[in-house]
């Protein structure tokens, strides 16, 4: 079976999340230092009696407001888009690492290259035909495939075995006769033992 994710993916996502947070705090500290400098310059001004001192006072207050406004706007944008997406991707990989995995056997239909966003993570979809015990009919299942990973190179009608977690593809491969024999032996052993 071909694994979609590796341990290095988890480590890369963790490093990316931490680096983005470090970059944010570095940028925020620059804005904070600039704000403190202009505030100290404002406090060191003498009482505003002349036009020149009043204009400096207004300049320092305006610069402080502008710097603070830019810092707030950039914080919302930065923490709302790149950091949030990196955090969601890391959370997905962390859930995959410890979560329950489900093994299925289905008939492959096609890959859908359109982008689907689920939980702030982008996916493509792999469409398979799967038997439903509840409705007693075949149903189309849209299995999520990470956008950053290559799509499975399968043909329409291939019988595949795949493992998912929360409908996200973790590994896949062609169904083989040896797997059937192995699973039958396990089932017979469970019934006898």
Question: What is each stretch, according to the model?
Answer:
Residues 10, 50-53, 102, 118, ...:
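Extended hydrophobic/Leu-rich segments
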Residues 97-119:
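Structural detector for short beta-strands of small beta-barrel domains
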């Amino acid at each position: 079976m071909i694994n979609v994710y590796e341990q290095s993916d988890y480590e890369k996502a963790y490093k990316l999340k931490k680096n983005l947070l470090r970059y944010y705090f570095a940028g925020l500290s620059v804005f904070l230092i600039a704000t403190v400098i202009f505030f100290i310059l404002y406090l060191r001004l003498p009482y505003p009696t002349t036009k020149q001192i009043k204009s400096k006072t207004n300049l320092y207050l305006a610069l402080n407001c502008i710097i603070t406004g830019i810092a707030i706007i950039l914080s919302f944008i930065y923490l709302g888009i790149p950091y949030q997406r990196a955090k969601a991707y890391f959370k997905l990989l962390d859930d995959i690492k410890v979560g329950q995995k489900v093994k299925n056997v289905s008939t492959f239909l096609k890959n859908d290259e359109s982008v689907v966003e689920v939980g702030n993570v982008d996916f493509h979809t792999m469409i398979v035909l799967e038997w439903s015990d509840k409705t007693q009919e075949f149903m189309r299942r849209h299995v999520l495939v990470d956008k950053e990973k290559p799509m499975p190179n399968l043909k329409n009608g291939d019988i595949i075995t795949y493992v998912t977690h929360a409908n996200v593809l973790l590994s896949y491969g062609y169904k083989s006769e040896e797997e059937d024999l192995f699973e039958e032996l396990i089932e017979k052993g469970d019934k006898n033992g």
